[in-house]
Amino acid sequence: MFDGFLRAAAATPDIRVADCKFNGASAAALVSEAYEQGVSLLVLPELCLTGYTCSDLFLQESLLDGAQKALITLAESTRDRNMIVLAGLPLTVNSVLYNVAAVLHDGEILGFVPKSYLPTYSEFYEGRHYHSGADIETEILFNGRKYPFGTKLLFRCRQMPAFTLGIEICEDLWVAQPPSIGHALAGATVIANLSASDETTGKDIYRKSLVSGQSARLVCGYIYADAGEGESSTDLVFGAHNLICENGSFLAESERFCNQMITADLDLSKLVSERRRMTTWQPKFNDDYRIIEFDLEMHPLELRRYIDPHPFVPDDRTDRARRCEEILTIQAMGLKKRLAHTHCQHAVVGISGGLDSTLALLVTVRAFDMLDMDRKQIMAVTMPCFGTTDRTYHNACELVHRLGATLEEVDIKAAVTLHFSDIGQDPSKHDVTYENGQARERTQVLMDIANRLGGMVIGTGDMSELALGWATYNGDHMSMYGVNASVPKTLVRHLVRYCADTADSETLKETLLDILDTPVSPELIPPEDGQISQKTEDLVGPYELHDFFMYHILRFGRHPAKVYRLALQAFAGVYDAATILRWLKTFYRRFFAQQFKRSCLPDGPKVGSVAVSPRGDLRMPSDACVTLWMQELDEIVE
């Protein structure tokens, strides 16, 4: 356990029906295996110390005594193992039999949680043997000592309070109001379900939907351990369908009909962050719940979890295509509404031959098609200046032609040169004034053309540029509607690729592919030998890194050190530690310093879970200090 991560396991032991000694030894073997794998929470199935299918044998004292002895032995196997283990058994309390989960830690029993809902329908007959433990909160005597017993028990790690465990048993999940709802609202971040769910055709799909839905609804980790081979096959077969889910996403799933252990690293700090962000998450400080604390040693964990280096871009090609179509539609629908509301008949787009302006033009074309407006009323303006290359100029012109928009060329060299003369700027000095003077001239041209036509200037800047402040204030920073404002650079590339793949013209596809192949550049510095000399990623860092940083910082509010650690894993073999740390510091420094630009952004549609609009997802002071975050980064030892 480290950095808010918890390695959890769900395991199905090999059992023999009613052979408690064998079953206890089998469970203990899984404890040893889990310990070797660095597991901090091991969940075993319902009634695994006896077998779920003992039926009327549950009324035999020999079986019940054997289960207790097996539990005592199993508890001892957890000593000095730095883990929590959950195991199921039948337990008699005040002459009444309960189906319970025992919570074991460091050789001790922490408590017992009974099953609330007992199915007595179809193939199930639990009401014949057991009583419901719903709403029971007491202490019981077991093996000469008193232990907590009840459904409202939570188990919390002192060293990492984000690890707070709630427990339910099998059918408890299948009812209208599962106990896990109360557990989560009382503070549980992890729900363990000890289950014995038999297999019938199609049941696995429904089971997965229950686990996924509950995990998402409760913003929690959900570990589901299922009974498997070894249970009686008199009437039923059990598939050992083990599942580990986090906030609706499956981290691990066992192969059915094969007893095995699955493990996954739950990100508990992410769950806490998500709950904190959602103001509709309203915990109930319920005095009925009893918190039982335990100790676990904190140690670095070599993550087995896949960390997506491109969190804004789906890996699956089909899903990516669907997502691209959806995003393009959202962008176009936003612009469509603005055009219709303003009765605007013209759109003005500055087109450079780069990715962002290409996407903005493609979106504008979609919006005009939705409105049944003539594409010729889209004024695509190319404004060559000192840094423009033949390649980008040609691609800009070709793109406009293939899309059927109107092309207007305004060479701004003379205007910018005159402006430099007016303000005393040396044109041979390629500083920020030299660059920003061109950007602001372009914006002025676009705004004035829009006024001439009674049109609207469509913004081209993307979210990655806005996060870094890589935009000229009141230059390309400004427009009348910014269609790309919540689209990160890594996603821009895939959106343009999708448009190329679905283009109805081979020449349009070729143009888009060449634009994709062109280095990202503002082209504000003169080229060298006709080639782009100013490459954005050489100056501010790789956009794939910055998009990764942005996602984890804005979406989950992670500590800088954790962002760094995740990036090391996500980009292993791509960037070394020094490179990642260098650009992470750059991101934080620029992100804080450039907020003043984001504080006055034009309107634009939100397309994903992260956005930087000052009216929506990011309401941040423009003069906040970055010191706290930089100090944490300075403490990192590479």
For each predicted feature, which ranges?
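Enzyme catalytic cores with a strong preference for nitrogen-chemistry domains
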Residues: M1-G350, R366-R375, L407
